[in-house]
């Protein structure tokens, strides 16, 4: 679908039903504009979303929602004036524009002409996941996943699965004349199992997703999700209490990158650096990590959960190098913070919906691979912990301090992975941990497409990833 077709799709969904041709949008900008206004935009959004769940062998259509609305924003210096409406109409737009202008407390006017089309390479197909399977097929998919889990081992007592899909159409009209549209599909499938043995119960989970439709959940993927979830639960049934203390920790590839995302990635977002609240503020060009550590944010990877063709300000996403060979090289920016910091836009302006303000946010954030074979990394450890999967955690974004619980971990003894352990928590400081990376694997892996990031009350889909990493001297909280 080319740019004109995307715009036509968005116009048909968001503008034409409400008689909002370009002339009327021009009038809204005219009512909104002020002499010292630095920027302004209108953000139209239409979303259909559904959720299906399976528990105790029963599939339920848990949710179905249709939401639409428009957000009106004006920027003056560091100030943002914002109003939104869940009604799309010329009258509602005029009201929102007046409210926004009143917040800005400025007078005057400036015409805007919505003529230019914004263009960016497409990162996914404009699919409608909800229409890609009928209801019976969605039920059958969840039931098959349950059967696969139970068939793997008789100790599996409970299976819970969730299937979700979203079809989103957005249109961004900007005061500089650009008009950009995007059609964003999103799907997610997750499963959790509980296994029981000798009165002990343990859980395991798996799943995946991306910007595509339900066709991605092939039989092979369902079998892999079942294997991962059940195997994790069975490993935890045999796990010993984790030791506590300061030790070498090896992080597995893929989803353990969530620690990098939370404890380090947020500190590389423009707003925290502009306000001086990030541990990385004022350190551009300085060494902030061990040699060999390169961290990027890339919103252009095809079909990934965190990818976007354009961000929520209509700017094309890109690959941004944040840390290069241990040196701080870049930050993630939206238009407000890029302008105030006099730094380039990176296409990271994101919002949960039309009713939320844009913030600089991550897309797919990961550490690049190094030169070491993962087996070599394990062999180098005399005594330590191998954490291959994470559960929940807490992070202080300002300081980078974190506590993360390992959902699956093992002891490393004399260069070998030995027994599984349970109850391990990793405790540390993100920027400090970056300096303690001593070996980087050649096995970069991205997460399976399940991540959601929260910031200032807003949730957006993201991707994470990393290769196998050896971290010297990290505090481990245990139960032994």
Enumerate the predicted regions with their spans.
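N-terminal small-residue-enriched
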Residues: 1-480
């Amino acid at each position: 679908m080319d740019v004109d077709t995307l715009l036509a799709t968005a116009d048909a969904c968001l503008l034409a039903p409400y008689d909002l041709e370009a002339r009327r949008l021009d009038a809204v900008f005219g009512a909104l504009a002020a002499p010292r206004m630095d920027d302004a935009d209108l953000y139209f959004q239409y979303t259909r979303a559904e959720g299906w769940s399976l528990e105790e062998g029963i599939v339920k259509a848990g949710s179905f929602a249709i939401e639409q609305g428009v957000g009106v924003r004006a920027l003056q210096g560091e100030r943002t004036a914002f109003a939104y409406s869940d009604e799309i109409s010329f009258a509602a737009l005029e009201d929102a524009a007046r409210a926004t202008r009143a917040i800005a407390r400025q007078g005057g006017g400036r015409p805007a002409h919505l003529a230019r089309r914004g263009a960016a390479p497409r990162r996914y197909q404009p699919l409608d996941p909800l229409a890609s399977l009928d209801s019976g097929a969605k039920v059958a998919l969840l039931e098959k996943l349950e059967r696969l889990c139970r068939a793997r081992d008789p100790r599996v007592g409970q299976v819970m699965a969730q299937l979700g899909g979203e079809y989103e159409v957005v249109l961004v009209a900007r005061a500089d004349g650009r008009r950009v549209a995007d059609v964003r599909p999103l799907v997610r499938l997750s499963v959790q199992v509980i296994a029981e043995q000798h009165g002990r119960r343990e859980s395991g989970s798996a799943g995946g997703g991306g910007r595509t439709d339900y066709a991605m959940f092939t039989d092979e993927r369902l079998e892999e999700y079942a294997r991962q979830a059940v195997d994790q639960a069975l490993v935890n049934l045999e796990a010993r209490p984790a030791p506590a203390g300061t030790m070498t920790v090896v992080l597995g590839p893929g989803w353990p990158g969530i620690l990098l995302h939370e404890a380090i990635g947020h500190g590389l977002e423009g707003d925290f650096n502009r306000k001086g609240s990030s541990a990385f503020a004022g350190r551009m060009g300085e060494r902030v990590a061990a040699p060999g550590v390169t961290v990027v944010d890339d919103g252009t990877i095809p079909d990934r959960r965190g990818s976007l063709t354009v961000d929520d300000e209509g700017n094309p996403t890109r690959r941004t190098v944040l840390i290069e060979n241990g040196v701080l090289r870049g930050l993630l920016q939206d238009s407000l913070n890029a302008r105030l910091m006099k730094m380039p836009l990176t296409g990271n302006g994101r919002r949960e919906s039309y009713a939320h303000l844009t913030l600089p946010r991550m897309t797919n954030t990961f550490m690049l691979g190094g030169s070491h074979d993962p087996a070599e990394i394990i062999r180098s450890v005399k005594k330590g912990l191998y954490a291959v999967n994470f559960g929940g955690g807490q992070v202080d974004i300002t300081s980078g301090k974190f506590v993360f619980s390992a959902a699956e971990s093992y002891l490393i003894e004399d260069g070998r992975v030995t027994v599984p352990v349970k109850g391990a928590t990793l405790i540390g400081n993100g920027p400090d941990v970056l300096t303690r990376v001593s070996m980087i694997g050649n096995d970069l892996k991205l997460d399976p497409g399940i991540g959601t990031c929260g910031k200032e009350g807003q949730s957006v889909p993201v991707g994470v990833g990393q290769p196998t990493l050896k971290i010297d001297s990290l505090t481990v909280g245990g139960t032994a």
